[in-house]
């Protein structure tokens, strides 16, 4: 809940990287029958990368390689449109068809399961778009182009399926050969949409440190006796992300560095 950050600020720590996080795609499930219940945040890491799924913005347009890593996709969500003073890709939607639902689970719904409350259904793409608040013509054109590229075996727009990450990481369907582990047509109605949001696995900001994991003040001087490591420090990779577990290495490394330095610099009493 940010206790470490608050304590560091009270000690006069210099902060860095505060506008960045380890981004993740998420969807919300509301259960109105539970009056005091908070919404259920569902991570959307693999649904988007399977064959027969795309992500679109309110114009019905794709804006990213859906099989890319979740942090990179998260960055694409924060593109600001100065003309409309809005985020061009927020909100956004996962678009799938009945074939997808029959074959794959979707968030907390098993394959072939009933349509959940958070999923919008339409007999046609145009009907789906109207219900979801997406531009109908834009969505229809996007799906038509995507299906054409699938038939050609290549995503000319975002190169989805071109690299090893797209095809051999955990998100795709390994029962197919590349690039069809992640590329599949959306052409068997009814069609479905899930509104998505920008989520995060953790923050990348915190107090700045030196090579000894000592926290620095706003003049760049060491704050005596104060150390930081892991997610409690300004991330060593800045706004970059090394992948799953990418925060554990810095946590262990700088925890060790802090302990070693502290052990050899204990003031005489």
Q: What is each stretch, according to the model?
A:
Residues 35-41, 109-114, 239-247:
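Short beta-alpha connecting loops at secondary-structure transitions
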Residues 1-7, 233-266:
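A conserved FAD-binding loop/helix module that cradles the flavin
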Residues 1-31, 81, 248, 257:
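Glycine-rich loop(s) and the adjacent beta-strand/alpha-helix scaffold that form part
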Residues 48-50, 201-203, 244:
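Short, small/polar residue-rich loop motifs at catalytic or cofactor-binding pockets
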Residues 34-77:
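Phosphate/diphosphate-binding loops
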Residues 61-92, 217, 222-238:
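Gly/Pro-rich active-site capping loops and adjacent beta-alpha segments
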Residues 91-98, 104-156:
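N-terminal leader/propeptide and maturation segments of large enzyme subunits in energy/redox metabolism
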Residues 138-236, 240:
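A glycine-rich dinucleotide-binding beta-alpha-beta segment and adjacent secondary-structure elements
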